């Protein structure tokens, strides 16, 4: 239904108008009695195999929605009903920001990608708090912050379940800026200090760019080992335009911006795998970038991600993508459980045969008992020299060497 009816309608609009229409529709559904229940009935998948506990937080499933879709926290409860295990709102700034001039978001249908230079367009801290005050027990809401990190952290601390520090955002630091260890710690240390004085613990994640050199990725991974940082979100969009099917003329006309979607899949998985390997698999990773299919999701998890986030794949494939990923993960878990059960059953079935074979082997190794008629003769016989005596020559009453 999404691909045949809804997607053509949405794709006939500019991407920002389509996005706004979806948020308005979701909020309207949420106001209808039973509206969110109907969404859950159609799209949500619940299964114990999907449940995760990451940085001390329990997630109903590992599939989340990346920052940028619900920038102001307007529809996170309706998005939860669509099957997401968590939603990251933002990017949030202290004051409302209009962002960059339009047009600023572009679809690349031939590549299943989007180019975005929207900037930090959001309605500001106060409006976000107003939305996050709505009850959301049992559902995880993260908050993505760029610039003025400490102010946002303090004001949103009681409303969000975790925080993402978005150092990869071009709007909080100049494009191509080098993210040295000192630069990152200047951002993080005040947040750690504030958190130490609170009664509740809020995990802090660091979001990285796929365009960072591997050496910088390694240095950021090492920060996990040296600080109270809880994990990494990998990755943001890329400025790379290599290998696209969209014409160079079209790309030049669009201009600058971060590319997300299918062209990012391979690099995002590489970055996640590198961080996982470098950190010894001991720290949480949220994998995001180019997850367009259930197979992409499984590849990201296999690379070391603990949780996933969707964005562009959700736009191109619709709400059924979350359901399809969750179903695929459940099917894999059930298949693995069935294999383990079959292996255990086979081992149990083979156990009597193994025990019988062992008993027979033991019996063969036992010395043959001597008959009563031969015992006296054996007792009167000259004992064989110790070095040449064999088990066959030793009767049950023969003296055995100490073991």
Where do the PLM segments sit?
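N-terminal capping/small domains of soluble enzymes
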Residues: 1-141, 146, 325
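Short beta-strand/loop segments at the ligand-binding rim of alpha/beta enzyme cores
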Residues: 58-64, 137-143, 197-212, 277-287
């Amino acid at each position: 239904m999404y691909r045949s009816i809804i997607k053509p309608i949405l794709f006939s609009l500019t991407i920002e108008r389509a996005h706004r229409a979806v948020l308005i529709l979701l909020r309207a559904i949420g106001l209808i009695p039973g509206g969110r229940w109907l969404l859950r009935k159609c799209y949500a998948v619940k299964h114990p195999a999907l449940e995760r506990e990451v940085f001390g937080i329990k997630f109903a499933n590992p599939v989340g929605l990346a920052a940028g879709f619900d920038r102001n926290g307007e529809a996170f409860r309706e998005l939860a009903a669509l099957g997401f295990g968590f939603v990251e709102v933002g990017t949030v700034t202290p004051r409302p920001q209009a962002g960059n001039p339009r047009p600023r978001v572009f679809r690349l249908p031939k590549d299943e990608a989007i180019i975005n230079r929207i900037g930090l367009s959001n309605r500001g801290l106060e409006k976000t708090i107003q939305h996050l005050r709505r009850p959301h027990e049992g559902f995880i809401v993260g908050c993505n912050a760029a610039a003025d990190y400490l102010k946002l952290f303090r004001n949103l601390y009681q409303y969000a379940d975790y925080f993402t520090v978005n150092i990869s955002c071009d709007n909080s630091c100049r494009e191509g800026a080098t993210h040295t260890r000192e630069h990152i710690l200047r951002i993080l240390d005040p947040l750690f200090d504030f958190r130490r004085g609170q009664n509740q613990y809020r995990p802090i994640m660091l979001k990285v760019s796929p365009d960072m050199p591997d050496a910088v990725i390694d240095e950021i991974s090492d920060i996990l080992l040296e600080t109270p940082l809880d994990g990494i979100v990998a990755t943001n969009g890329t400025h790379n335009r290599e290998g696209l099917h969209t014409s160079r003329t079209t790309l030049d006309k669009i201009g600058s911006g971060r590319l997300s979607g299918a062209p990012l899949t391979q690099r995002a998985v590489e970055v996640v795998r590198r961080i996982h390997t470098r950190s010894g698999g001991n720290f949480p990773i949220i994998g995001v970038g180019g997850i367009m299919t259930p197979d992409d999701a499984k590849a990201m998890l296999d690379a070391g991600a603990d949780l996933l986030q969707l964005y562009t794949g959700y736009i191109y494939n619709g709400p059924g993508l979350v359901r399809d990923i969750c179903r695929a993960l459940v099917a894999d878990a059930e298949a693995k459980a069935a294999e383990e059960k079959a292996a255990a059953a086979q081992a149990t079935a083979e156990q009597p045969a193994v025990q019988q074979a062992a008993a027979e082997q033991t019996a063969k190794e036992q010395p043959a008992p001597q008959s009563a008629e031969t015992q006296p003769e054996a007792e009167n016989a000259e004992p064989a020299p110790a070095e040449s005596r064999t088990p066959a020559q030793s009767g049950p009453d023969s003296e055995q060497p100490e073991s």
